[in-house]
Amino acid sequence: MAKIWELLDQTYYFIGKKHYAEAQSILDKILYADPQNVEAWDAYICICTTQRDLEGLKSYIANVWETRVQDQDYLQATQRFVLQRVDEKISSL
């Protein structure tokens, strides 16, 4: 697999072109390898354009944390931060 920063560069390229499916595919790979990557989660928030997308993302976040992240306080803080960013975007729609 390419380096995470290279994959993020590709992701932002696709986001800039509004090719969200391609961006999502790359983000899924990044988050599989590094489920705590806040920049990848932030990019994921960028590709969500509706409240329904964002609600789906919240479910996805919960699933990733349940299945892929160890139960440690600082990781829970990361989850709370990402969910807060999603809620902020929902409020702005």
Question: Which functions belong to the PLM regions below?
Answer:
Residues K3-I26:
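Alpha-helical segment of the N-proximal tetratricopeptide repeat
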